Amino acid sequence: MTLKNLDWRALDRLRDGFLHGTAAHGPYWQSANDLAAYDLTYGERIGWKWDAVLRELRLRGWTPPATATASGELRRTILDWGCGSGVAGRRVAAFFGPENFSALHLHDHSPEAVEFAARAARTAFPNLGVPRWRPDSEPIGLLVLSHVLNELSPAARAELLVLARRAAAILWIEPGTHADSRALQQIREELRGEFHVVAPCTHQAACGLLAPGRENDWCHHFAPPPPEAFTDGNWVKFGQRAGIDLRSVPYSFLALDRRTDAAAPSEGLSRIIGRPKYFKGYLRFLNCDATGTAELMMQKRDDPALFKQLDRERGPLLYRWRRHGDRVVRTDHAIAGSGK
């Protein structure tokens, strides 16, 4: 199967389930054909979110941890929980190098999905072990979670957090919707006493977006689509047929690690939530730092180059501001990246 001959009957059924919540009622993969069509399209779009998160983690100096086995051997492993077609686990393994991992474990409530994901991983990484994962197996190294929250009942969510507490590190991506993002923010609060928050936050304090009065705000970001999303006619046709704006790829995410020195220090840094809003001669944005969240503004005349850059920046919007009250007057560029 390719983008030219997609199974639209399967894609329409899957998208309808995702949009109307029926995906939470049990396995929705009916065949390997379903998974192949999904992996090429919706799964690949999720992969763009993973690309953005992984680039940010590289900018922050983070690498996956090694964990000790029962025999004392240090190993780096990935557990892609709720793997679906396996795009998340493959993206992580490819980014850090499959040679740096001893195993990629897969779990899904659908045996069909696990089989597809394992086959795809073995094809992509012939020398990487993809053994069957057992819930009672040795400690979890890197736990990878992708678009699972809105498919979990309260009981299943609680069970997942029990599993998460066994991990050495967690990379978790969800859609950039208000509901999914705030649900992930709440999980951050539940786990931050046991893990070091690597990203998206620049601090270890309580989430400012969960403070009273911030109920309408949510922590979301935008991944830059690859050039082929605009230049490949098959992607253009897919976006039109599926009713998806491929220019906008919103997501929320959480990166946690038990190591307190897992990434470069981020004290004093701020993060722009979402995108700045431009007006004539000035802009406004929602800022997050260790003191909480606040609406800040910047006048074009104070820093014309930065004013223009903030509209074009494709990487994480992480800066060290110089402020007069709620007005940004300039910045020391910290680890904002190009997103390429």
Predicted features along the sequence, with ranges:
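C-terminal lobe and adjacent flexible extensions of AdoMet/dcAdoMet transferase-like proteins
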Residues: 236-340
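Conserved beta-strand signature within the Rossmann-like core of class I S-adenosyl-L-methionine
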Residues: 167-176
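Conserved SAM/SAH-binding beta-strand->alpha-helix loop
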Residues: 110
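A short SAM/SAH-binding and catalytic strip from SAM-dependent methyltransferases
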Residues: 141-155
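Conserved SAM-binding loop of SAM-dependent methyltransferases across substrates and taxa
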Residues: 85-99
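Class I SAM-dependent methyltransferase Rossmann-like catalytic core
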Residues: 26-60
